[in-house]
Amino acid sequence: MYLGVLLGGISREREISIRSGKRIAQALRNMGHVVDEIDVDDNFIYKLSELKKYDALFNILHGTFGEDGKMQAILDSIGIPYTGSGVETSVIAFDKYLCNLFVENTIERYEELSVVKIPNFLLISSEEFEESKIYMIEEKIGLPCVVKPRKEGSSIGTHICFSKEELLDALKNEFKNYDEMIVQEYIKGKEITVSVIDINGTPTVLPILELRPKKLFYDYEAKYTDGMTEFIIPAELDGETTEKINHAVLKIYKSLGCKHFSRIDGIVKDGVFYFLEVNTLPGMTELSDLPMSANAFGISFDELVDLIIKEACRKL
């Protein structure tokens, strides 16, 4: 097939997208496809008319514009097959507040999600924030707590705060970059990520990956710097817990309407899976989680990207 790989973008994850995109493009070439790398930069509007020439597009943009439903809406209007979830799913998954509400509602409706909980959370707006509200946040969420942007990826802008002073500093600093922040209960346990891919139209859960970062948590540096994280696959969980988490993740994936490939992150503590987020366009670098899980499942990187692009074309 004649394929285009959408990479780069205008978000703070641009460099990671380029790393992922170039690796994907080479893998697709290895599988016999003709591939162009399309940099989604400030001049992308002038490239739109050329997109129809491709049989399909592999979208590996991260963050704003690429992962939040905007690019998906553009590609839908053009009518070209693309990898990843559609507009509605992308909008919800990229918005951590909306996604928490969605998963909360899903937990209430399905018995197999009884293993899942969502850490307590608050949405804080820069317009409404006052220093005096720190005490209210501490009372409702407790310390330590996690501060993260409502809409962002790769743990950019994320802090773990152990005191009111750290919480105040984190909010003040991040409100320079974001209008809204989430303050969430900190759960200390096994940090895991569960990848799901579609195989012949059937969502399939890959082996659970346990993350043991050398830093306090799996932040941007730990994700993309070699040697900063120990990866355990399969995760060191008992069989019953593993089975329950797999069923729960599959239900979340299907209920949200995820397509082709996604990753669901969380913390396991005392047999409970504390949901953190859904990533509908997970990284595909040499250090990324989903390719590791696929490899443990017996799928090479070249086979993985070939499978994903072919799944995207199934909807024709």
UniProtKB/Swiss-Prot annotation:
Catalytic activity: 2 D-alanine + ATP = D-alanyl-D-alanine + ADP + phosphate + H(+)
InterPro entries in alphabetical order: ATP-grasp (IPR011761), ATP_grasp_subdomain_1 (IPR013815), D-Ala_lig_Van_CS (IPR000291), D_ala_D_ala (IPR005905), Dala_Dala_lig_C (IPR011095), Dala_Dala_lig_N (IPR011127), PreATP-grasp_dom_sf (IPR016185)
Primary location recorded for the protein, binned into one broad class: cytoplasm
Keyword tags: ATP-binding, Cell shape, Cell wall biogenesis/degradation, Cytoplasm, Ligase, Magnesium, Manganese, Metal-binding, Nucleotide-binding, Peptidoglycan synthesis
Pfam families, A to Z: Dala_Dala_lig_C, Dala_Dala_lig_N
Segments forming domain ATP-grasp: 108-310
Subcellular location: Cytoplasm
Listed Gene3D superfamilies: 3.40.50.20, ATP-grasp fold, A domain, ATP-grasp fold, B domain
Top EC group: ligase
Chain sites annotated for binding ATP: 138-193
Function of the protein: Cell wall formation.
Protein name, entry field: D-alanine--D-alanine ligase
Gene encoding the protein: ddl
